[in-house]
């Protein structure tokens, strides 16, 4: 996505842009700003024929990147000193892909040094961006890399992936300006099965998913099968003082199935085989595609158990009814029913534009209260075959994302919206305390 995000949107996105070539004809002085007329009338297509593997490959970065194999994992609870990549304002989730375009000599030099070592750097989760305050973060490992020169400027293009959560112990700045973070690697607490205390080990083997599991979620046969499976799995609850449904609230397998039902509502073509089977990896996959603000995301990042994380995610998915403009707060932009997936990563993924700004972009069928600015362009499109047009909040003018329109009539969907997470505020009903005062949303842990 090119950096033509509008004035305010460009200023709020972090890194200063590098020198750029002369503007193209698509960016002439006759820039349009019109109210979108067909955002509300858009309908879900019967089928999607777009290649969902294209966005995840980040082909706009180039196809001749040097790839690395293997992975670097640090011991749980160990203390490590890891360099911090400056200007990266993303709250990275383990397993999430992070594309980067780096122009600053300091960043280019740092990445070159990392390539010669373990290719790992720290991404800080800023709880207060203005004060540059961070107590948590995620290690990121480079798995693809390319150097090039454009207009006399050395640039580095990188694809990295989030690995492990950490707690920040200390941050020091070297003489060359690079920050070094002393961190403690946070472990994943694996909780035992809810029935392990009352169930014989020989009986637990019988509760593995049988091969006869129906594959169609909306099928009546699946619901019947699931009820029988749950009854058999938690039958030992009769030996305790608690009912079976209480145990199911803390059962990883049951929580994963409930979350999958929500994911299938977002993506009717979703195949269970494409999702991680490990509860830890699955919980991170879901966390990375939830359209929540940083306040909620850092709550997820702090949680050290997949079961607690899944419960929190399920609570968010059930409570979040719509998404509003973060600046206006009351201007509704879209609802959760309009979310769909156009990528193998899910409905939301991180992308980077030519000026190095990273946007975690959510795909939706319909959006409202938006104005379109500028002309459609296919340059640097994150979704090959689609042209993008800048979208701004109709009330405050805040940059919200882009409208994507197909360049060919046989493509489906013909149009959709890509909304940037940093501009969205999830609408979650606030609880009230005993005095009737509003409180922050309390997520189910």
UniProtKB/Swiss-Prot annotation:
SUPFAM superfamilies: PUA domain-like (SSF88697)
Subcellular location: Cytoplasm; Nucleus
Transmembrane segments: none
Pfam families, per database record: LON_substr_bdg, Yippee-Mis18
Phosphoprotein in keyword set: no
Keyword set, alphabetical order: Cytoplasm, Metal-binding, Nucleus, Ubl conjugation pathway, Zinc
Predominant location category: cytoplasm
GO cellular component: Cul4A-RING E3 ubiquitin ligase complex; cytoplasm; nucleus
Binding site for Zn(2+): 325, 328, 393, 396
One Gene Ontology term of the molecular function aspect: metal ion binding
Ranges of Acidic residues composition bias in the record: 23-36
Protein's UniProt keywords contain Cytoplasm: yes
Residue positions binding (S)-thalidomide: 380, 382, 388
Domain CULT: 320-428
InterPro entries: CULT, Lon_prtase_N, Lon_prtase_N_sf, PUA-like_sf, Yippee/Mis18/Cereblon
Region listing for Disordered, in residue ranges: 1-50
PROSITE patterns named in the record: CULT, LON_N
GO biological process, any: protein ubiquitination
Disulfide bonds: none
Domain Lon N-terminal: 82-321
Subunit structure as annotated in this protein's UniProt entry: Component of a DCX (DDB1-CUL4-X-box) protein ligase complex. Interacts directly with DDB1.
Note: Thalidomide is teratogenic in human, chicken and zebrafish, but not in mice. Binding of thalidomide and related drugs changes the substrate specificity of the human DCX (DDB1-CUL4-X-box) E3 protein ligase complex, leading to decreased degradation of endogenous target proteins and increased degradation of other proteins that are not normal substrates. This is probably the underlying cause of the teratogenic activity of thalidomide, possibly due to abnormal regulation of the BMP and FGF8 signaling pathways.
Function description: Substrate recognition component of a DCX (DDB1-CUL4-X-box) E3 protein ligase complex that mediates the ubiquitination and subsequent proteasomal degradation of target proteins, such as MEIS2. Normal degradation of key regulatory proteins is required for normal limb outgrowth and expression of the fibroblast growth factor FGF8. Maintains presynaptic glutamate release and consequently cognitive functions, such as memory and learning, by negatively regulating large-conductance calcium-activated potassium (BK) channels in excitatory neurons.
Similarity comment: family membership: Belongs to the CRBN family.
Protein name: Protein cereblon
Organism encoding this protein: Gallus gallus
Lineage: Eukaryota, Metazoa, Chordata, Craniata, Vertebrata
């Amino acid at each position: 996505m090119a950096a033509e995000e509008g004035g305010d949107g460009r200023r709020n996105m972090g890194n200063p842009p590098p020198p750029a070539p002369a503007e193209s004809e698509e960016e002439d002085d006759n820039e349009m700003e019109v109210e979108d007329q067909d955002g509300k009338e858009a309908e879900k297509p019967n089928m999607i024929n777009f290649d969902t593997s294209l966005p995840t490959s980040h082909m706009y970065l180039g196809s001749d990147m040097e790839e690395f194999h293997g992975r670097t994992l640090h011991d749980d609870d160990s203390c490590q000193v890891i360099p911090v990549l400056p200007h990266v304002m993303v709250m990275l989730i383990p397993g999430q892909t992070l594309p980067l375009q780096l122009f600053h000599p300091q960043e280019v030099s740092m990445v070159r040094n990392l390539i010669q070592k373990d290719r790992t750097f720290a991404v800080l989760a800023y709880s207060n961006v203005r004060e540059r305050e961070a107590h948590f973060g995620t290690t990121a490992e480079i798995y693809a890399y390319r150097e090039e020169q454009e207009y006399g400027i050395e640039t580095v293009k990188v694809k990295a992936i989030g690995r492990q959560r950490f707690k920040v112990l200390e941050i020091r700045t070297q003489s060359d300006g690079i920050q070094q973070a002393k961190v403690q690697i946070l472990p994943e607490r694996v909780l035992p099965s809810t029935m392990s205390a009352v169930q014989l080990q020989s009986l637990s083997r019988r509760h593995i998913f049988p091969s006869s599991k129906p594959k169609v979620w909306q099928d009546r046969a699946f619901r019947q099968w699931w009820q029988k499976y749950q009854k058999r799995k938690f039958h030992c609850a009769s030996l305790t003082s608690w009912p079976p449904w209480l145990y199911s609230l803390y059962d990883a397998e049951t929580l994963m199935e409930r979350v999958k039902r929500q994911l299938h509502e977002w993506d009717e073509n979703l195949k269970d085989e494409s999702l991680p089977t490990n509860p830890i990896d699955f919980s991170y996959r879901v966390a990375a595609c939830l359209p929540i603000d940083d306040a909620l995301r850092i709550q997820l990042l702090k949680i050290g158990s997949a079961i607690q994380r899944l419960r929190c995610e399920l609570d968010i998915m059930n409570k979040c009814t719509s998404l509003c403009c973060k600046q206006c707060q009351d201007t509704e932009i879209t609802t959760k029913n309009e979310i769909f997936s156009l990528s193998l990563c899910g409905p939301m993924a991180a992308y980077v534009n030519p000026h190095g700004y990273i946007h975690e972009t959510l795909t939706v069928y319909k959006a409202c209260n938006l104005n379109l600015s500028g002309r459609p362009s296919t340059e640097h499109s994150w979704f090959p075959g689609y042209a993008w047009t800048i979208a701004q909040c109709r009330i405050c003018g805040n940059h919200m994302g882009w409208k994507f329109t197909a360049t060919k009539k046989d493509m489906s969907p013909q149009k959709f919206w890509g909304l940037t997470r940093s501009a969205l505020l999830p609408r979650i009903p606030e609880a009230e305390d005993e005095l009737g005062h509003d409180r922050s949303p309390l997520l189910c842990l």
